[in-house]
Amino acid sequence: KRLEAMSFSLLDLFALERTAPQLVTVQAQALARAVAESMGYVMSQSGVELRLSVEPGSFPGEPNLLKTLLYNLLDNARKASQSRSSVELLGCTTPQGYLFQVTDHGRGIPQEALDRITEPFYMVDKSRSRKEHGAGLGLALCDKIAKLHGTELTFVSTMGLGTEVSFELEY
């Protein structure tokens, strides 16, 4: 199962290298609801509550890529969280566009790892990643999707308190 997931992630990365996304107008709340629905089962199995606070708004983007981006960020947040905790997906308009932020209250990421976490195959906690069938490709894929949308992932993390990952999609 781990090898299969890694193969699909590698194929996704290669495909993103070769094609430009077809941008359409994306509705933030519809995107967030779709991702939340697809996350429902894994969140409940982990005992982690997904909290949404997403303002109305729209922006240019490729919906399937943005779903993949948010799904992977939320799944990483879930994996870092304890049972009976929560993960938040926030979305709000800004003067420049639309900001998404995923917040967990998990272990946090060591400061020395923050510069490397979007590198393919890099894993902060290898034992947890193997248990969760991770291959170290999820954040590399997220980083690539963000860059294709003209933005970057911003990580703020405190050990023992959790992590916030945000990105802003410009109008």
What kind of region is each of these model predictions?
Residues 17-22, 54, 58-61:
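Conserved micro-motifs of the catalytic ATP-binding
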Residues 42-51:
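Short conserved segments within the C-terminal catalytic ATPase subdomain
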Residues 77-78:
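Short helix-loop "hinge" at the ATP-lid/N-box region of the Bergerat-fold HATPase_c
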Residues 84-96:
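Short beta-strand/loop element within the Bergerat-fold HATPase_c
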Residues 104:
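Acidic ATP/Mg2+-coordinating residue in the GHKL
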Residues 109-121:
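Short conserved segment of the HATPase_c
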Residues 150-151:
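Conserved glycine-rich
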